[in-house]
Amino acid sequence: MKKIMITGALGQIGTELVVKCREIYGTDNVLATDIREPEADSPVQNGPFEILDVTDRDRMFELVRDFEADSLMHMAALLSATAEKNPILAWDLNMGGLMNALEAARTYNLHFFTPSSIGAFGDSTPKVNTPQVTIQQPTTMYGVNKVAGELLCQYYFTRFGVDTRSVRFPGLISHVKEPGGGTTDYAVEIYFKAVREGHYTSFIDKGTYMDMMYMDDAIDAIIKLMEADDAKLETRNGYNLSAMSFDPEMVKEAIQEYYPDFKLEYDVDPIRQGIANSWPDSIDTSCSRGEWGFDPKYDLVSMTKLMLEAIEQKDTVKNNN
């Protein structure tokens, strides 16, 4: 990868992906795009940026051509809970945007990455140590989009020879960008509330285990997969990824090591709880580890320490300005 275009660059993953790619490949070699302008304090604005609605194929093609991109990371999407509230918009944005991005990759011979998700699984999927290849019958529009997306990426690889690569992300946890519309968002919100208010009301019930990963590990995984030897990639699209599996009570206990008086209550959201119940408790990541060396660095304990320290520092800086 030498010149990279990233869609959805202002999202939770996109923001940090842009920053990391610019560190590695050079600021001027990474074009960030999104449907809206970055805020004044966004790190994304410190380099090339263009407005892009991913459902506008002509505009996407224009940006790829003008930037002379050799790689496209397509991150723009409507997330699980938001997609369930507006399934038609979710289909139009998630699938229409992906088709446009894949067509751009085919037309301009781009290396291509897009994320899938544990949302691609469903009630009939084995819930413990979920295999790489298994039943995928999701019960949400977001999940349907992700399964279709995996199949489309594989189709473009086998039919047109497009170098497509993707991973099934678990819940991603970060202090840089606050969450927006995901089922696993409680695992980010809980840290902000712990620092700022000393208590949190979770919309996901106790005993609900979901796979999670710290954002630094997720960003490293994207870059590692994109730089991996093509000949070693047997799975290619939809690699299982996870670094840890926990429920809200486990996060509470980890936080209480630093904030002993932290309180956790529950007000379960039936929509997001229903989505969570359809996902695995834990997944098998052996293909990712074996084919391209996936090796997450953070567990719940180390992640909790980093999250709390980062939020404390962020609030200190904000209060001093």
UniProtKB/Swiss-Prot annotation:
Coiled-coil boundaries: none
**GO molecular-function terms, A-Z:** L-threonine 3-dehydrogenase activity
**Alphabetized Gene3D superfamilies for the sequence:** NAD(P)-binding Rossmann-like Domain
Could you provide one GO biological process annotation from this protein's UniProt record? threonine catabolic process
One Pfam annotation reads: Epimerase
Q: Which family does it belong to?
A: Belongs to the NAD(P)-dependent epimerase/dehydratase family.
Any idea what this protein is called?
Uncharacterized epimerase/dehydratase SAR0558
